[in-house]
Amino acid sequence: DLISEGKVIYVDLEDMYCKHAETSFDLDAINNSDMNFAYDAMFGAGMNAVKRLLPNATLLHCDDNPGFLGTAPEPIHRNLQEFSDLIRDNNLDCGLATDGDADRIGLYDSEGNFVDSHHIILLLIHYMVKYKGMTGKVVTAFSCSVKVEQMCKHYGLEQETVQIGFKHISGKMITEDVLLGGEESGGIATTGHIPERDGIWMGLILFEFMAKSGKSLEDLIAEVYAIVGPFAFERIDLHIDNDTKHSIIEDCKGGKFTQFGKYKVEKVETTDGFKFFFDADTWLMIRPSGTEPVLRTYAEAATQEKVFDILADCKATIL
């Protein structure tokens, strides 16, 4: 009755979304390129839109499964091993994964290697500024790579670091001329769309970048490295009781930690948590979860080995 009376109206948001994407991207370039793209919806909300927008893509977990096959629909490498294998074993060029509500992105190169959000943010800036001639401010969360700031300096863009939580980025996107906003957990937004995270949208930008440049994802990452240098990043969550967590944070506030193993602290930033810099490109961050007995530790360095070494020294120092 409410429908017939016009009090309840059904709106096809998926159709609106796809039409918006069709006018915003060169989908012909993507769909007619020689490159083979893959998509893992993780049984989430992105499945039907991507089927429509990318009819030639290799699809995984694009059907309904209320239990998500027992795997949390979070696009991080440990949840995407099947997708990684699919890409590597079938000679696919690039794979996009999105989470349950399709706002966070995971990415794989042709070898099935996971590409983290820091690299994705840098790739997006590189494409939009160098290849498309766009400009604007870049806003990133406190846990993001220092390479973002270096990339922005290279291109003459203003960059601002904000607290963790996408609301801090969305607010800036609504009131300022922001080119891109991004956070470490895979939530990224760009101008010309909504001031909110959208994993499918970011994937389409990257697929378009590859298709129109004719370059592999690995080659495009090499272009980024030519500007900011190679780097690696990792986050490890330490599950500890709240008393221990509180004690460690008090030690951070009190300036107790001046060295972690062989890594000497040169400066500390405290925008949201504690970021201990060992040099301009190498840092460790400690931040408590606000909702659970977890201490989040993050590190960035030139190599993966060094990142894990820093995180191991951190754990040994604080616990």
Predicted regions and their residues:
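Gly/Ser/Thr-enriched, mixed-charge loops and adjacent short helices
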Residues: 1-90
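Buried hydrophobic positions in well-ordered alpha/beta secondary-structure cores of metabolic enzymes
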Residues: 21, 40, 80-84, 96, ...
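Gly/Ser/Thr-rich loops at beta-strand to alpha-helix junctions
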Residues: 42-47, 102-103, 144-146, 303
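Short acidic, glycine/serine/threonine-rich loops at helix termini
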Residues: 48-53, 70-72, 105-110, 148-154, ...
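Short hydrophobic/aromatic-enriched beta-strand-loop microsegments
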Residues: 57-61, 114-119, 156-164
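Short, charged, surface-exposed secondary-structure boundary motifs
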Residues: 66-73, 125-128, 169-173
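Phosphate-binding and adjacent anionic-ligand microenvironments
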Residues: 94, 134-319
